[in-house]
Regions:
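The catalytic Nudix box helix
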Residues: 39-73
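Residues that scaffold the ATP/ADP-binding catalytic core of kinase and kinase-like folds
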Residues: 24, 47, 132
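N-terminal strand-loop-strand
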Residues: 1-38
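Short, well-ordered beta-strand micro-motif
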Residues: 14, 25, 97-99, 122-125
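Nudix hydrolase/Nudix homology domain
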Residues: 31-35, 102-151
Length: 151
């Protein structure tokens, strides 16, 4: 079996004033039936810290520009292995929490890979997230959020 490609990533738990979290609907370009929901974020650029990467990804994927310091420290970290576009990855990722009043998501800064694998976004309530049968990541997302904020 092939060794996984090591990848560092940063993600943002973006929660609005209605206590909803923003998730993007993605799919594997090599298998479009492999669908999932995930938080804004992605791989770090060379030399980039997790907080810098989280702020950059947040702007690229939502149009929301913030200073990295606005994100504070990571609230969660995990390591996941997954296959995407026929490649096996081992991804270490830091999650940051950002609460905002509201936001009209702007995806015009998506890169080519995001345009090829993300087709929509949605603001989810915790009840909707807990009730859905659709896969989302991290799988502990509702528990994680409830442990961080009162929803």
């Amino acid at each position: 079996m092939a060794q996984p490609i090591a990848r560092l990533a940063a993600r943002v738990l973006l929660i609005d004033e209605a206590e909803r979290i923003l998730l993007f609907h993605g799919f594997d370009p090599a298998d479009p039936t492999d669908e999932f929901w995930l938080t804004p974020g992605g791989g770090l650029d060379p030399g980039e810290s997790p907080v810098q990467g989280a702020a950059r990804e947040l702007f690229e994927e939502t149009g929301l520009r913030i200073a990295p310091a606005d994100l504070g420290e990571p609230v969660f970290r995990n390591v996941v292995e997954f296959t995407f576009n026929t490649r096996l990855y081992r991804q270490e990722q830091d999650f940051f929490l950002l609460r905002i009043p509201s936001w009209d998501v702007d995806t015009t800064n998506f890169d080519e890979g995001e345009r090829a694998s993300v087709d929509r976004y949605r603001w989810w309530t915790m009840a909707e997230l807990e009730a859905t049968a659709e896969p989302y990541y991290p799988e502990s997302l509702p528990t994680l959020i409830r442990g961080l904020v009162e929803v």
